[in-house]
């Protein structure tokens, strides 16, 4: 039995482990296709880019995760676009460097709920 296990281990070392189990192994086509499709996905957004009027404060963390549309469409003339949005709250530490104070508070961010491939605008 030990000789068989050794032979199997050597074979895997030569040919590679079964799909997806070894770093560098190719991801199967259907998984690549599914992951790349137009859909909501967790995205990091900068607090200052989302709330540019807050430049006098520092934030910890400086970015948050929200769901945003992203991915590929089946036709290059289409773009992955949000068709539904909602406001979500995230607890953030707001630091006022001038007053040397900080407090935890809830800030609102736009999160996408639905996505669709739509024709690209003439300006984009």
Curated annotation (Swiss-Prot):
Tissue specificity statement from the Swiss-Prot or TrEMBL entry: Expressed by the venom gland.
GO molecular function: chemoattractant activity; growth factor activity; toxin activity; vascular endothelial growth factor receptor binding
Location(s), subcellular: Secreted
UniProt superkingdom: Eukaryota
Keywords: Disulfide bond, Growth factor, Pyrrolidone carboxylic acid, Secreted, Signal, Toxin
Pfam family name, one: PDGF
CDD domains per UniProt: PDGF (cd00135)
Gene Ontology CC annotations of this record: extracellular space; membrane
Disulfide bonds: 38-80, 69-115, 73-117
Keyword Cell cycle: no
Tagged with keyword Disulfide bond: yes
Assembly mode: Homodimer; disulfide-linked. Interacts with VEGF receptor-1 (FLT1) with a high affinity, whereas it binds to VEGF receptor-2 (KDR) with a low affinity. Does not bind VEGF receptor-3 (FLT4).
Protein name in UniProt: Snake venom vascular endothelial growth factor toxin apiscin
Organism from which the protein derives: Agkistrodon piscivorus piscivorus (Eastern cottonmouth)
